[in-house]
């Protein structure tokens, strides 16, 4: 640890020296083509990803929340999970073994917990199958799109989805080094460089490495990330872009702590897995080629080819139940080797049609792709003949490493084609109407190699979306929207048939008030329903059927305001009532897990310039998350409410150099982020501090 701190301190010293000796250099900046699928990063007043056309937020009949690059830096966001408390209506779900993918719900509805949340990238669908957690070195901003987006982006939840705006190659040469050290022995270093190769070609390279310990015993991870990008301006009207990302993450598979009789009895530090199981290894490779052509001032075309493959494998010993003595935890040992491969081709044509009575903004797009998903799992439960248990108060490791029989061996293939049409009609300066629909045709093949069964189903789904927007004046707008969604269910029922997909409906009304050019207050009321949710088969509890129905309704209030050049405030509040409407086992009114009825946050930042032109900033953030169900069956086990206080400060002696200090969980509150059951509970980090350095040159 001392060597790492020495390296960090030396880097800070070198950067201080360089700030007095390095001169700025510049090169000619070329104008690049503005692509709808490749925005420079969403901001408070402009939106592209919600309709594919760039608009003032007051002209769009939907709601969203944006986390800019500045906010991401101020709040020391290291993972998408860290950003969720700053967004209304978005809640943490279990992130699979301590952080092997991003997972969260929108307005109470979440996707398959064995795959993670659906995410789009620069307005393009890319996240089908497994995905490693996104690295922040490539992220310009996070755009949380609320409400029905299936008509634009295909299958997903009715509550919304996340659009990640990534950084791009630039024609002005620049480099950036970021170093970070945390009191929990978490270390990170990243390097970014972009420059022109010629007047027509520019590149960008990003590299990041993490070496993370944990406040939890025997839990650690190491992560490598590499991303080369290339942009070629073929002509004044045509541009070709290539993006790639390579991620490897090695780490402990950690299910967290367990409860006994619905009570929190364990020390949050205690690890009940098996260190001798070794690390889980995750590899994620992503490639994307985009071609954009501008026909004229009114019409353009975007094309994209995306290829993605991800693998996760390793051994783990996971909690199963605590015996009647209240201290002996029975474990289940597993080996998993899961892999997904996805290829997707997309084409979209966007244009404007001006008529005497209205202006039309028209989108026509198609998608063609294939995704393969393989699950291989070996597992064995604790038994008298082959024990595998541990004392939760005095764990002794290395006693049991039982041999494992094959338990799951499945392969799923999805071939899909989609056609999408949308038209937003601006009748005048006040009224606009948006209508659109997407038709999906999916062939789903599922093979259970262990049982020797297979099933195939062709699915057709039409997802409409309607929106009405009324802009009263330059400050006020009101809107309403309706949309439908669907999401595939993986697996087979007891008859060997592939499940029908989940189907959802969403209704929303809301208003927006632009207090100042840099301040926005927004209110949204919503109601959603979903059917064909998987539930236990009453004829055989070893299987499931699509007989469940759930609903969610609520209110979201967001404020983003820049009071002056120095002082900014960001606040949000959510009320979400998400519950079961129909189920074979659960009672009507049972709560959906990890969804608090009440939550909110408020943050403020104050910045000023000293007499010598040095810049200083101070900030604070308070987070509240209410009580929520901690079990997927809502069996009476609850995660308690919690309040966190975070602080941040920075000092920038030059435009090229910035030092930052962050304190997380200042009051050192014991809290729990999310859980899958009363056996798998993810505790939050205790009081910790981080120091970071940013050096641009």
Residue ranges and their predicted role:
Residues 210, 214, 226-294, 307-340, ...:
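Acidic/polar loop-and-plug regions of large Gram-negative outer-membrane beta-barrel proteins
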């Amino acid at each position: 640890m001392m060597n790492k701190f020495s390296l960090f301190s030396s880097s800070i010293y070198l950067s201080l020296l360089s700030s007095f000796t390095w001169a700025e250099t510049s090169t000619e900046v070329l104008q690049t083509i503005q692509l709808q699928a490749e925005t420079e990063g969403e901001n408070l007043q402009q939106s592209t990803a919600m309709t594919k056309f760039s608009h003032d937020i007051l002209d769009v009949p939907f709601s969203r929340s944006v986390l800019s690059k500045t906010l991401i830096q101020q709040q020391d966001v290291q993972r998408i999970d860290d950003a969720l408390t700053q967004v209304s209506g978005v809640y943490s779900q279990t992130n699979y073994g301590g952080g092997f993918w991003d997972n969260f719900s929108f307005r109470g509805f979440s996707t398959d917990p064995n795959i993670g949340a659906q995410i789009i990238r620069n307005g393009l669908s890319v996240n089908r199958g497994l995905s490693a957690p996104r690295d922040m070195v490539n992220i310009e901003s996070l755009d949380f799109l609320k409400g029905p987006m299936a008509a634009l982006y295909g299958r997903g939840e009715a509550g919304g989805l996340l659009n990640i705006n990534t950084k791009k190659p630039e024609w002005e040469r620049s480099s950036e080094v970021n170093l970070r050290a945390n009191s929990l022995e978490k270390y990170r270093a990243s390097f970014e460089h972009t420059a022109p190769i010629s007047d027509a070609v520019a590149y960008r390279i990003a590299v990041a490495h993490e070496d993370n310990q944990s406040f939890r015993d025997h839990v650690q991870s190491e992560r490598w990330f590499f991303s080369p990008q290339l942009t070629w301006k073929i002509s004044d009207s045509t541009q070709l872009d290539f993006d790639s990302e390579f991620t490897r993450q090695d780490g402990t598979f950690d299910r967290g702590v367990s409860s006994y009789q619905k009570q929190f009895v364990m020390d949050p530090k205690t690890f009940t897995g098996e260190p001798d199981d070794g690390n889980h290894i995750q590899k994620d490779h992503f490639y994307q080629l985009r071609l954009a052509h501008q026909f004229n001032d009114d019409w353009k075309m975007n094309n994209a080819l995306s290829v993605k493959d991800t693998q996760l494998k390793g051994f783990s010993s996971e909690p199963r139940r605590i015996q009647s003595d209240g201290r002996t935890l029975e474990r289940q040992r597993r080996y998993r080797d899961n892999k997904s491969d996805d290829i997707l081709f997309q084409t979209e044509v966007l244009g404007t049609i001006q008529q005497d009575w209205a202006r039309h903004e028209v989108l026509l797009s198609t998608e063609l792709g294939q995704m393969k998903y393989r699950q291989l799992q070996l597992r064995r439960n604790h038994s008298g003949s082959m024990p595998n248990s541990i004392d939760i108060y005095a764990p002794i490791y290395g006693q049991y490493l039982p041999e494992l029989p094959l338990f799951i061996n499945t392969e799923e293939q999805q071939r899909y084609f989609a056609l999408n049409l949308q038209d937003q009609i601006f009748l005048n300066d006040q009224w606009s109407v948006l209508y659109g629909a997407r038709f999906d045709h999916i062939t789903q093949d599922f093979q259970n190699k262990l049982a020797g069964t297979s099933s195939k189903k062709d699915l057709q789904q039409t997802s409409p979306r309607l929106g009405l927007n009324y802009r009263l004046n330059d400050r006020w707008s009101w809107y309403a929207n309706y949309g439908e969604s669907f999401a595939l269910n993986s697996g087979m029922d007891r008859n060997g048939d592939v499940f029908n997909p989940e189907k959802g409906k969403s209704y929303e009304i809301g208003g927006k008030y632009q207090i100042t050019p840099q301040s926005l207050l927004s209110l949204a009321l919503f109601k959603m329903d979903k059917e064909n949710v998987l539930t236990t088969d009453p004829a055989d509890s070893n299987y499931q059927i699509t007989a469940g129905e759930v609903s969610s309704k609520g209110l979201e209030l967001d404020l983003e305001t820049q009071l002056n050049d120095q002082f900014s405030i960001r606040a949000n509040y959510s009320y979400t009532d998400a519950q079961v409407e129909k189920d074979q086992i659960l009672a009507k009114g049972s709560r959906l897990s990890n969804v608090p009825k009440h939550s909110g946050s408020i943050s403020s930042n104050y910045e000023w310039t000293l007499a010598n032109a040095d810049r200083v900033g101070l900030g604070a953030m308070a987070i509240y998350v209410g009580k929520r169900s901690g079990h997927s069956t809502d069996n009476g086990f609850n995660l308690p409410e919690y309040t966190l206080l975070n602080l941040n400060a920075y000092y920038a002696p030059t435009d090229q150099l910035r030092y930052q200090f962050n304190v997380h969980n200042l009051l050192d509150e014991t809290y729990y982020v999310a859980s899958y059951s009363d056996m798998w509970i993810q505790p939050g980090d205790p009081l910790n501090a981080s120091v970071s350095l940013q050096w641009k040159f």
